[in-house]
UniProtKB/Swiss-Prot annotation:
UniProt name for this protein: UDP-N-acetylenolpyruvoylglucosamine reductase
UniProt keyword Flavoprotein, yes or no: yes
Organism (species): Rhodospirillum rubrum (strain ATCC 11170 / ATH 1.1.1 / DSM 467 / LMG 4362 / NCIMB 8255 / S1)
NCBIfam families: murB, PRK13905.1
Entry EC no(s): 1.3.1.98
Amino acid sequence: MIALRAPTPLIDRLPAVRGRLSADVALAPVTWFRVGGPAEAMFKPADAQDLADFLAGRPRDVAVRVIGVASNLLVRDGGVPGVVIRLGRAFTGVEVVGETLVCGASALDATVAKVAEAAGLAGLEFLSGIPGTLGGALRMNAGAHLREMADIVVLATAVDGLGQSHTLTPAQMGFSYRACALPEDWIFTGCVLAGRPDERGAIAARMEALRQAREASQPLRARTGGSTFANPDPDLSGGRRAWELIDAAGCRGLRLGGAQVSEKHCNFLINTGEATAADLEALGETVRRRVMDTSGVALRWEIKRIGIGLDGLSAGENG
């Protein structure tokens, strides 16, 4: 009889690193929704070179995902096969250089806005209301209040899936509405952002006005993943934004299991306490169907969905 050899654990197939490499890491505690299964492995690189060396040396059949603070992310209940990369302290720097800010990709958007305010640099106030890190903001061309990352990026640095480092102009990043054109396996490591001189008091006043507007209109203290769907092309939606289409479809307050469409802002899904990732995703798909039925508009997920369901299957991550 031929003895069957057990498969080699993923962690033992990965290259040596200077950062932290761990197996079977719970992801639910780090996501804003507080749902989802574990990462098969997680890598926290010591610095950009450690990240590049890991990507260059990993087996080509091992999938890689990067997450920040998981504020706009839904991890499915079966977890994430392969390696989840989470940039840490080495990527959190924010330095003012003239009228620019040199930032690591793991710096919080809100922190960058505060540093800009303290330096008397305007134009970055909108970042104060965007949850998450700059890496995620670059990846999705995050924006609010008629401003977006494409308006302030001078250049960015990234490492591709083969471990090669790149310095990119905005044109090379191919920004569009809530998207950039870089391949999914490229990982942003930093960027340079442009501001313009202004009075600190005026900047602070604008940021406070934005904070008050968010408090009044969004469920900031709920377990939520931020805006669920991107606003559709105005030419296709008659100028209506995603929340207006959702409201018109009768979905405000709609529930499925432990998931609910927010009563306060119906482009937000909420974990009421006992939701699974499957509840949240199914509710989102129900909303999409109802909007299509009532308005003919196909809403596109803005929340990134990763991993596999408990049935071992993975649904689409976009659309």
